[in-house]
């Protein structure tokens, strides 16, 4: 994270992590398409001929909100994906460095269970090598490819979510379903963590719920931030007012 209090600007890094072909790049493409044009930059992708990410994808976004002091603040977000193939372990660690929050994109297909587990362990290992832990980094989990046959049932995913602390989202990124909800949850957890560590509410003059309402509008959900906040199983997203 980078803070410029004089300019009232915050820059953060979000990373989409997960096994190969779980839909990380598809999430970013859908996010780019669904976000309002004045809030998104150019999506940069570098793929091989078999549609696998070679190094990383990156999507720049900017969210603007009015402060209680009458000014405005900007949150600049760079959303990265990592290559899922085992041979790119060093690249994943490099991209993960400095991440303010992570979305783990799991493949819902039953046949991909072991790959999901191996990738999650890889995330834990890489964070440890970077001197961090899973407890230190805001995390959301997305089960993608819900439109395919032979996937984990909703009941199985719900049970898994209730046993964990992280919000779990269900998605079909290729159809744009669950993409905004997953990103909104990730952005909110990142903002809440940074606000707690750096007192952004006081220093920037904007409350988390105010900022997230503006972000929801930029994502095409004006006035519907509570709807987005309820789109997960387990975990928690937006704090209740007065809490």
What are these regions (language model features)?
Residues 1-50:
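Conserved G1/Walker A P-loop phosphate-binding module
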Residues 21, 85-86, 109-111, 145-149, ...:
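Conserved nucleotide-binding/hydrolysis micro-motifs of P-loop NTPases
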Residues 40-88:
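Switch I (G2) and immediately adjacent beta-strands of P-loop GTPase domains
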Residues 51-54, 66-72, 93-98, 129-135:
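Conserved catalytic network of the ASCE P-loop NTPase/AAA+ motor domain
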Residues 88-111:
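Inter-motif core of Ras-like GTPase G domains
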Residues 101, 108-164:
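Conserved C-terminal guanine-recognition region of P-loop GTPase G domains, centered on the G4
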Residues 137-140, 147-200:
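Canonical P-loop GTPase G-domain recognition
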Residues 177, 188-243:
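C-terminal-of-GTPase-core extension/linker across diverse P-loop GTPases
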């Amino acid at each position: 994270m980078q803070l410029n209090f004089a300019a009232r600007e915050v820059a953060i890094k979000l990373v989409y992590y997960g096994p190969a072909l779980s839909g990380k790049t598809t999430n970013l493409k859908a996010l780019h398409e669904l976000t309002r044009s004045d809030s998104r930059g150019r999506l940069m992708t570098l793929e091989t001929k078999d549609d696998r990410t070679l190094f990383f994808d990156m999507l720049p976004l900017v969210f603007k909100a009015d402060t209680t002091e009458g000014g405005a603040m900007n949150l600049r977000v760079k959303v990265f994906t990592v290559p899922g193939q085992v041979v790119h372990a060093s690249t994943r660690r490099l991209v993960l460095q400095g991440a303010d929050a992570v979305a783990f994109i799991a493949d819902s297909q039953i046949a991909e269970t072991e790959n999901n587990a191996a990738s999650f362990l890889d995330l834990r290992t890489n964070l440890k090598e970077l001197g961090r832990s899973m407890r230190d980094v805001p995390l959301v989990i997305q089960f993608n490819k819900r439109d395919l046959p032979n996937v984990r049932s909703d009941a199985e995913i719900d049970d898994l979510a209730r046993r964990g602390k992280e919000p779990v989202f269900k998605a079909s990124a290729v159809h744009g379903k669950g993409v905004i909800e997953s990103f909104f949850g990730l952005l909110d957890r990142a903002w809440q963590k940074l606000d707690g560590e750096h007192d952004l509410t006081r220093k920037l003059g904007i409350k988390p719920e105010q900022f997230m309402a503006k972000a929801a509008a930029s994502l095409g959900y004006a006035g519907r931030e509570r709807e987005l906040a309820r789109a997960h199983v387990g975990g928690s997203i937006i704090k209740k007012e007065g809490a």
